[in-house]
Amino acid sequence: LEFLIKRIYIFPTLIMKKIVAYIVLIFFITIYLISSHIGYMKKVTEWKYKSKTIFASDKYSYGDLYGMSYYPIKEVFGSDSLTVPIDKYPNTKNKNLCLVHDSYLGGAFLKQKYQLSGIDTIFDIEYPWRNKPSTPILLDTTKINILVFEIVERHLLTLFDSLTATNVVKFKINIPNAINKRQIIQDEITTASNNSPIEKIVQILFCENVNTNLEFVIFNSRIFTPFKEFKSYINNTFFDRKATDIFVSANKKYMFYSETRTSIEKKITNAEVNKTVKLLNYVYEYYKKKGFSEVYFSIIPNPVSIIEPDCENYNNLIPLIQNNKNLIVPMIDIYTVFKKTNNNIYYHSDTHWNKNGFQLWLNEFNRKTNE
């Protein structure tokens, strides 16, 4: 009888253990499948960055450099106030703007369209390394057509070349003889959707990004942020170890992306400067022949070039190019403006400029295009 009683008590316990084990197994299988599926990961990512729950992500709430390091320098991204004046110019709407840009411009720039003097239509084009297709443009000969190339300093010598520059702007008149980027992407999507069920299963089971995705789904949540900050604090305080992709300013108030330092410390030869000037001139003349009324370039300084140029042995890349006697390209010179201002123009925990830096660029854009 005693044996039967024990069995009666043990049996439900075993059942509960199995139920819990199956629940845990199903949970982790579900997480794995979600992390292996592009469509599901896109939805999860969108939810994590929009949600305010403890399971959502705050990785970029304080800037991209904070999200890379969790170093205890953080500033609520976008919370800064504008302290520079907004220059006013007549808005005649007689210009069309084709803007080729990286992450410094784009969405935020387009939202400020009402500040752009004389601009009617904006063609928004991102560089190929941004992995976003652009729509072919059609120049309106009844208006002034302006082309602006904006590029951050660290990318000028490494990613910008004649092939990239002369192919980044697509014209509608070339569509019959060329391939539209959007069509390429659509074809890839169609091809992927036509894969056999077995091929789809293999793609999910052996997804090359699954480890990164799993880490994002499980650990990229607000609930883990205090632990990440504590780990970063311990590593920095007691072991003098920081994330390899960032370094901290001498006054401990700013974080910088490591690539911004290496790009300005590299010694620049006269041959490299002349080669870059020749490239900019070539691109300028190429697009003038394509029908643009004017072509401008704007090199955005790395934050460290403005904030700590002496500490990091700045190679003066921007002034060497902009002051070169052979340069024929009109420049939207934000470097000189930034060097003169007393305003804070960069975020403390992000690679980008803040509202002041952005507004100063808008002011200089309007001034230059209204000369």
Q: Language-model features: where?
A:
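Extracellular glycan-modifying ectodomains
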Residues: 1-371
